[in-house]
Amino acid sequence: MPRVKRGVTAHARHKKVIAQAKGYRGRRKNVYRVANQAITRASQYAYRDRRQRKRQFRALWIVRINAAARECGLSYSRLISGLKRAAIEIDRKVLADLAVRDKAAFTTIAEQAKVALSD
């Protein structure tokens, strides 16, 4: 068996890591060991935050819907309950967008929810 020298493979791997660390500051951009740690940590943060972003946006939508609902004389929970009773299937993302961009449409929906609650 001939001896396997891994210099080419190792160099390619190091090059790949250094390329991923482009834009980092200090030794994180050009020292393999430090860059590798930085990239690993960055990947972990990215993975975690892709999931957190979904939670944060939902929380933002709920805050916006609640504020608009209170202007219409309803709390958030009563509005959602009224929408379910009225069989209006609009998700929170669209409701929040209506609350910000089209107050008249949101008010109409809120009124329908009020009617459904009183029945």
From Swiss-Prot:
Matches recorded under InterPro entries:
Ribosomal_bL20, RIBOSOMAL_L20_CS, Ribosomal_protein_bL20_C
Q: Which PROSITE patterns match?
A: RIBOSOMAL_L20
Q: Which domain of life is it from?
A: Bacteria
Q: Which SUPFAM superfamilies match?
A: Ribosomal protein L20 (SSF74731)
Q: Which GO terms describe its molecular function?
A: rRNA binding; structural constituent of ribosome
* UniProt entry keywords in alphabetical sequence: Ribonucleoprotein, Ribosomal protein, RNA-binding, rRNA-binding
GO terms (BP aspect): ribosomal large subunit assembly; translation
Its Gene Ontology cellular component terms are:
ribonucleoprotein complex; ribosome
The record's annotation in HAMAP family points to:
Ribosomal_bL20 (MF_00382)
Family stated for the protein in its record: Belongs to the bacterial ribosomal protein bL20 family.
Relate the protein's function as given in its record: Binds directly to 23S ribosomal RNA and is necessary for the in vitro assembly process of the 50S ribosomal subunit. It is not involved in the protein synthesizing functions of that subunit.
Protein name in the entry? Large ribosomal subunit protein bL20
